[in-house]
A protein has these predicted regions:
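Active-site HxH/HxHxD metal-binding segment of metal-dependent hydrolases
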Residues: 2-80, 165-169
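Metallo-beta-lactamase
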Residues: 54-58, 78, 84-171
């Protein structure tokens, strides 16, 4: 990670999690220490973040505990990075307070683990709720333009219009 960031001439300026499942917080301590960044999450993710040590033990995964949040992100807030404005969309269901980052001007959304190519986020982990996830997708993501590119937390990108038509979990 460090070498790629250096090779690309980048400088991390924020540490933001879409949600706090263990696979998304494993690097928080490293990133926070390396670039002196505070963690930003939705307040509703605190219980999930605080369960990180227990969950890592269940999976046998080494874990340097994440720092506590330095600030909280709320639905409708805007994040500006290098001139790109991203609006916070509240999309619970995969976790209690998942958020997505929508860039209207450039036509993309960072979807975390809410919506995937022909799939959706799992809801069998603590704080997950299938009906809530479906509602979030339909009311927060499926109202975006069809050509909006979705960059999920895992797997290939997709488009809102494609998922409306072909996602078997939503049709």
């Amino acid at each position: 990670l460090t070498q790629t960031i250096k090779d690309l001439g980048l400088k991390p300026v924020r540490l933001i999690n879409t949600h706090c499942h263990i696979d998304h917080i494993l690097g928080n301590a490293f990133v926070a220490k390396t670039w002196d960044l505070g963690l930003e999450i939705h307040k509703g993710e605190i219980p999930v973040l605080e369960s990180g040590l227990m969950v890592s033990g269940m999976y046998g995964v080494p874990y340097d505990p994440s720092p506590k949040p330095s600030s909280f992100l709320n639905e409708g807030d805007e994040i500006v990075l290098d001139g790109h404005v991203m609006k916070i969309l509240f999309t619970p269901g995969h976790s209690p307070a998942s958020i997505c980052f929508y860039n209207m001007a450039d036509g993309w959304v960072i979807g975390g683990d809410v919506l995937f190519y022909e799939s959706i986020g799992r809801t069998d982990l603590p704080g997950g709720d299938h009906a809530t996830l479906l509602k979030s997708i339909r009311e927060q993501l499926f109202v975006l333009p069809s050509e909006t590119i979705v960059y999920p937390g895992h797997g290939p990108s997709t488009k809102i219009g494609y998922e409306k038509m072909f996602n078997p979990f939503l049709n």
